């Protein structure tokens, strides 16, 4: 008798995706972050669902409803902090996942890579609208500043901003629609994740050597299910330590002050995972230029498959590109640090240099390094 998981229409899909999937035998722990992102998404949807049961999306009661969740709802404080810190874990995994893709040349799988960029942008949008919901000072002013950037779009900008706000300022209409967006977007993300996996399983996974691994594949279960489970345990441990011991370490103290349109915080800044893009935005004096740089800072990822001219797959055997890669990572950390600093010398200057370097490494230096490495290969 044939095994049910191989014949049943529904189980067959699960079987081909998570059980009998042929997987390269040498993929390292850097390949764990895809499953960890799936885990993060599940945690966020579940905790978010329970928070939505008690939250009210009205300017008069939003802030106090979050306080009510923390004080009066059974384990509400835990659900709230798991959700807030779960977002941080989500973005840590996301950055590592994208960084792995760049390092090992996974961007040659263009469909998977491009849907990944769409996922990244959708996740950023979800996190942004979610940050507005507690209706604290930083929620309100963050929403005001970031949505206002759309006014830089020529001709239709001002109308567009007023249309997104649902009025002439960030108010009740804005909060209500942001809650609606924040509720629906994770399910859209989940749908995109399935498309992401569909495209990935068309070609199979990449591997650290950058060589074709068709001659050496092993089943996903039990080898990688157990490996992913270890990753999940470690992720949950870090998340629990964050949520239970340091719940506010990644948050902003200003968000414990209810939103007040008449009082601007000293330093308006987004959550830590947006700081690199915020630093790039601020480093350009022109408003429209800043907005374009902000958008390009993410969309530049789509250039990787186009700019790739290397004869080798991934950076494993490419020392020059490796050096550039780690400079790029360090530069990204510098941008993250600058994003949280006040707009004054020397921070502005450092931010401008880092922003230029961010784009230069990807668009100019890495392709040049590839050409040099190709030339070196020909010598031997």
Swiss-Prot record:
Keyword line: Electron transport, Heme, Iron, Membrane, Metal-binding, Mitochondrion, Mitochondrion inner membrane, Respiratory chain, Transmembrane, Transmembrane helix, Transport, Ubiquinone
GO biological process: mitochondrial electron transport, ubiquinol to cytochrome c
Residues that hold heme b b562 according to the record: 83, 182
InterPro entries attached to this UniProt entry: Cyt_b/b6_C, Cyt_b/b6_C_sf, Cyt_b/b6_N, Cytb/b6-like_sf, Cytochrome_b, Cytochrome_b_C_euk/bac, Cytochrome_b_N_euk/bac, Di-haem_cyt_TM
Localization per record: Mitochondrion inner membrane
Miscellaneous field: Heme 1 (or BL or b562) is low-potential and absorbs at about 562 nm, and heme 2 (or BH or b566) is high-potential and absorbs at about 566 nm.
Subunit structure as annotated in this protein's UniProt entry: The cytochrome bc1 complex contains 11 subunits: 3 respiratory subunits (MT-CYB, CYC1 and UQCRFS1), 2 core proteins (UQCRC1 and UQCRC2) and 6 low-molecular weight proteins (UQCRH/QCR6, UQCRB/QCR7, UQCRQ/QCR8, UQCR10/QCR9, UQCR11/QCR10 and a cleavage product of UQCRFS1). This cytochrome bc1 complex then forms a dimer.
Protein name: Cytochrome b
Species of the source: Delomys sublineatus
